[in-house]
């Protein structure tokens, strides 16, 4: 880690006000077939060393492209900046959630400081998925899907290394969403389409929990 990166480490005592706005018209939370969801989150600094404000906007819409098909498109935008024009803390830097860019290890792409991935001040992701015809009989609780992801993390306020911000990452793959008695399970098999030479890819991923 660089000296500048080490200077951002330490313990801090901060107070933030979190505001959430959620407009949901989905017909159901799991295996959604119609509707959309708009979410906006803002993290306002009340008492903070860096006075960092974080904004997040998430939009997802569902619909049918053909009979017995469900397709979705989502947008994820996030920013984190200091109101005092200071360098934000390492813990306040942005890493994309794992379901926003499948085919890559979480936190293992984007800006680097030496050998360390440090996240960015900005992130954006665009995700498209579409169900494919049922392969198994009596599989109402299982969705087979095809997906395409494109995303980027960029911006280093103290820039002291490789931003890698010009590289748009993208991936393609197939997945299974399965509603079980223990909860929703998700399995994905993905392949990176575009990436940076420093990125760490990940072909298979398993998640316990919802994918919406």
For the regions a language model picked out, list residue spans one by one.
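Short amphipathic alpha-helix initiation/capping segments at coil-to-helix junctions
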Residues: 117, 121, 161, 165-169, ...
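Outer-membrane beta-barrel transmembrane domain signature
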Residues: 150-172
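Glycine-centered small-residue hotspots that permit tight backbone geometry or close packing
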Residues: 35, 97, 103, 169-175, ...
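A short, acidic, flexible beta-alpha connecting loop/helix-capping segment that sits on the rim
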Residues: 190-195
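C-terminal outer-membrane beta-barrel translocator/porin domains of Gram-negative envelope proteins
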Residues: 2-142, 146-150, 154-156, 198, ...
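Outer-membrane beta-barrel "beta-signal"
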Residues: 18-19, 176-183, 201-212
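A short pocket-lining beta-strand/turn micro-motif at the edge of beta-sheets
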Residues: 140-144, 168-172, 181-185, 202-204
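Short basic/hydrophobic patches in alpha-helices and adjacent helix-turn junctions
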Residues: 130-133, 174-179
């Amino acid at each position: 880690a660089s000296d500048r990166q080490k200077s951002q480490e330490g313990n801090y005592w901060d107070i933030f006000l979190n505001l959430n706005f959620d407009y949901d018209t989905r017909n159901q939370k799991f295996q959604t077939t119609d509707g959309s969801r708009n979410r906006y989150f803002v993290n306002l600094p009340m008492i903070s060393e860096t006075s960092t404000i974080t904004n997040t906007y998430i939009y997802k819409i569902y619909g049918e492209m053909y009979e017995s098909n469900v397709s979705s498109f989502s947008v994820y935008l996030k920013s984190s900046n200091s109101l005092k024009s200071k360098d934000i803390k390492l813990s306040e830097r942005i890493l994309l959630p794992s379901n926003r860019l499948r085919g890559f290890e979480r936190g293992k792409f984007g800006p680097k400081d030496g050998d360390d991935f440090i996240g960015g001040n900005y992130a954006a992701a665009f995700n498209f998925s579409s169900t494919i015809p049922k392969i198994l009989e009596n599989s109402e609780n299982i969705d087979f899907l095809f997906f395409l992801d494109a995303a980027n993390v960029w911006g280093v306020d103290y820039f002291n290394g490789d931003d890698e911000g010009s590289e748009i990452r993208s991936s393609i793959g197939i997945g299974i969403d399965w509603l079980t008695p223990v909860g929703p399970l998700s399995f994905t098999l993905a392949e990176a389409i575009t990436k940076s030479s420093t990125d760490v890819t990940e072909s298979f991923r398993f998640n316990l929990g919802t994918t919406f």
